[in-house]
């Protein structure tokens, strides 16, 4: 059963942790556009250009140093890495609603520090019993300065042919930054009790080969032929290409994860949050229109 869905008073401020990051900046702007007061919280004031009334706090610092920045918080968005959720729980007022960003990396077959940190943060939230939600996005694209499709487009400019592991048949379901922001704002507007975890993803899944072709089209690049190579060979090549000046780097771990299907059911995202994500082709068109 879905919880009741009622709006919070618009005048309640939202404390945004990680406000200087890509998702944090997008959330702050969207809140301001709706007339909702924002309390931006950053680790480094020098990175907070364009943000007003900032507070400086680092979730890796002792709890007593973080508490003052959150003392008056009733709604908190945390776009910092999910590994910081235990520290957030310790520092935030017990009554504050929490909306945190995780990652679908938690599902990888090859655990790493990033994915393990997401699992740690998710477990802390779910075990806390607090009114909070952790949203797990797939690959996020479309933010200013993002390092996913923009880096891929930059790499494609160097390649006469496109090598993909196993022919690029694994599925991906990237989510546009605007939809990530919409999900965060939708969660803020909901009322529920207890902790929740929810995957957010794009409207449609495509093969990685199709994804690359769509990035080519959207970025104005000519179509290049594909070749299928083993992941092991491509991972070995990645160690070599990392030394080439000016060539965008793709790490061996990233290549290995191209073998995983990353397609997800988004019915909870649509039903609970009420967000209908845009089509990948439309999102890429918006991204490269900048």
What are these regions (language model features)?
Residues 6-8, 12, 187-250, 266-267, ...:
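Mid/C-terminal beta-alpha module of Rossmann-like enzyme folds, strongest
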Residues 46-112:
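NAD(P)H-binding glycine-rich loop region in Rossmannoid oxidoreductase-like domains
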Residues 126-143, 153-155:
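Conserved beta-loop-beta element that borders a ligand/cofactor-binding pocket
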Residues 36-43:
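Conserved glycine-rich Rossmann-like NAD(P)H-binding loop of the short-chain dehydrogenase/reductase
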Residues 134, 143, 168, 173-181, ...:
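Conserved loop-to-helix N-cap of the C-terminal "lid" that shapes the substrate pocket in Rossmann-like
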Residues 14-34:
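N-terminal Rossmann NAD(P)H-binding glycine-rich loop of SDR-like oxidoreductase domains
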Residues 154-175, 183-187, 191-194, 199-201:
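A conserved pocket-lining segment of Rossmann-fold NAD(P)-dependent short-chain dehydrogenase/reductase
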Residues 17, 41, 79, 98-104, ...:
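SDR active-site strand-loop-helix element
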């Amino acid at each position: 059963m879905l919880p009741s869905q009622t709006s919070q008073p618009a005048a309640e401020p939202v404390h945004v942790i990680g406000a200087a990051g890509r998702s944090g900046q997008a959330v702050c702007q969207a809140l301001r556009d709706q007339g909702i007061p924002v309390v931006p919280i950053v680790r480094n004031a020098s990175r907070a250009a364009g943000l007003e009334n900032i507070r400086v706090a680092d979730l890796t610092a002792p709890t007593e140093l973080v508490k003052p920045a959150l003392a008056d918080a009733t709604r908190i968005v945390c776009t910092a890495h999910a590994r910081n959720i235990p520290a957030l729980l310790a520092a935030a007022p017990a009554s504050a609603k929490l909306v945190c960003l995780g990652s679908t990396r938690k599902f990888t077959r090859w655990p790493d520090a990033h994915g393990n940190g997401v699992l740690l943060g998710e477990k802390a939230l779910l075990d806390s019993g607090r009114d909070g939600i952790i949203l797990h996005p797939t690959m996020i694209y479309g933010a200013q300065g993002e390092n996913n499709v923009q880096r891929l487009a930059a790499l494609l400019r160097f390649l006469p042919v496109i090598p993909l592991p196993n022919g690029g048949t694994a599925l991906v379901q990237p989510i546009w930054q605007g939809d990530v922001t919409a999900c965060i704002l939708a969660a803020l507007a909901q009322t529920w009790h207890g902790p929740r975890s929810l995957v957010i993803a794009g409207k449609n899944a495509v093969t990685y080969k199709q994804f690359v072709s769509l990035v080519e089209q959207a970025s104005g690049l000519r179509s290049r032929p594909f070749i299928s190579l083993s992941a092991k060979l491509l991972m070995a090549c990645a160690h070599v290409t990392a030394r080439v000046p000016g060539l965008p780097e793709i790490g061996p771990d990233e290549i290995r994860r191209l073998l995983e299907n990353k397609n997800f059911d988004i019915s909870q995202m649509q039903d609970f949050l009420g967000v209908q994500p845009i089509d990948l082709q439309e999102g890429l068109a918006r991204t490269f229109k900048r």
